[in-house]
Amino acid sequence: SKLREILLHKAIYNKRDLQMTVEGMLYRMRTGCPWRDRPKAFGNWNKVYKRFNAWSAAGKWFKVFKMLVAEPDMEWVFIDGSYAKAHQHSAGAASANDEAIGKSRAGNTSKIHLAMDAHGLPIEFEITGGQINDCTQAPTLISKLPAAETIVADKGYDSERIREQVERQ
């Protein structure tokens, strides 16, 4: 499969249980269930969790994402932001890393600012705290995009500065 080739290319060791480990990670990302509640068929939850964290810390998931979107259809690009409520204990102990959790009316939230190609496939994203406005994050997101024929966005991105940036690009 395409994903398997990318994983091996990104120096992820091809262990016997690689497929089920990755399936377990993807299942957890799709459903949002706690790691412990994944079906047992995906293997030991703690082992899968530790691998996921190690790959994330090493930037391997981001590299996999970039390889999966190697040839986006840039005729139309859609950008928008969406909130995700963070767990009540997510703002626990202080960390040196930015966890992208902010305070908003809904409590602790994160926000994904996403750009999609003409087929609706994600091509670029930024994750911020939930209190970050779409129009303040748009310049960063747009600057990462290859040239697009048309960029479509909702009124949260309506500003002269963003229009000028899109026209320059």
Map each language-model feature to its residues:
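Short alpha-helical elements
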Residues: 1-169
